[in-house]
């Protein structure tokens, strides 16, 4: 049976890990053992934070809608309920954008909500 030497494969694996660890601080960028641990942990953080990002943006949109709604005399929950009653189907991302960038359009939506709740 032929002898298997894996130096080339090991070098390629190490190179891959060190490329992923580029930009890390201290030994984490150039010592294979610490770099591998740091890259693994970075992957865990990245996976977790892809989930957290969705929550964080939804929270931000709700805050912006709430601010716009309060200028029109509603609380956030009253405003969302009014949208439902009025039959206006619009997601929070779009509502937050309208509240921040187009106050006239948001006022028109708020007037429709006010009419639906009256």
Curated annotation (Swiss-Prot):
Q: Which PROSITE patterns does the entry mention?
A: RIBOSOMAL_L20
Which BP terms in the Gene Ontology apply to this protein?
A: ribosomal large subunit assembly; translation
Q: Which UniProt keywords apply?
A: Ribonucleoprotein, Ribosomal protein, RNA-binding, rRNA-binding
**What superkingdom does the record give?**
Bacteria
Nucleotidyltransferase among keywords: no
One Pfam family of this chain:
Ribosomal_L20
- Which molecular function GO terms apply here? rRNA binding; structural constituent of ribosome
For this protein, the parts annotated as crossing the membrane are none
Q: Which InterPro entries match?
A: Ribosomal_bL20, RIBOSOMAL_L20_CS, Ribosomal_protein_bL20_C
Q: Which PANTHER family match?
A: 39S RIBOSOMAL PROTEIN L20 (PTHR10986)
Q: What does the UniProt record say this protein does?
A: Binds directly to 23S ribosomal RNA and is necessary for the in vitro assembly process of the 50S ribosomal subunit. It is not involved in the protein synthesizing functions of that subunit.
State the similarity comment: Belongs to the bacterial ribosomal protein bL20 family.
Q: Write down what this protein is called.
A: Large ribosomal subunit protein bL20
Organism of origin is Caulobacter vibrioides (strain NA1000 / CB15N) (Caulobacter crescentus)
Query: In the record, what lineage is assigned to the organism producing the protein?
Result: Bacteria, Pseudomonadati, Pseudomonadota, Alphaproteobacteria, Caulobacterales
């Amino acid at each position: 049976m032929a002898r298997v030497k894996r130096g080339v494969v090991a070098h390629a694996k190490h190179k891959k890990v060190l490329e992923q660890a580029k930009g890390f601080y201290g030994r984490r960028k150039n010592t294979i053992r610490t770099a591998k641990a740091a890259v693994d942990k970075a992957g865990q953080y990245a996976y977790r934070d892809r989930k957290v990002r969705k929550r964080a943006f939804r929270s931000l949109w709700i805050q912006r809608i709430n601010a716009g709604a309060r200028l029109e005399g509603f609380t956030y929950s009253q405003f969302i309920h009014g949208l439902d009653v009025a039959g206006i189907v619009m997601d929070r991302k779009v509502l937050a954008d309208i509240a921040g960038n187009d106050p006239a359009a948001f006022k028109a939506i708020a007037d429709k909500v006010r009419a639906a709740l009256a």
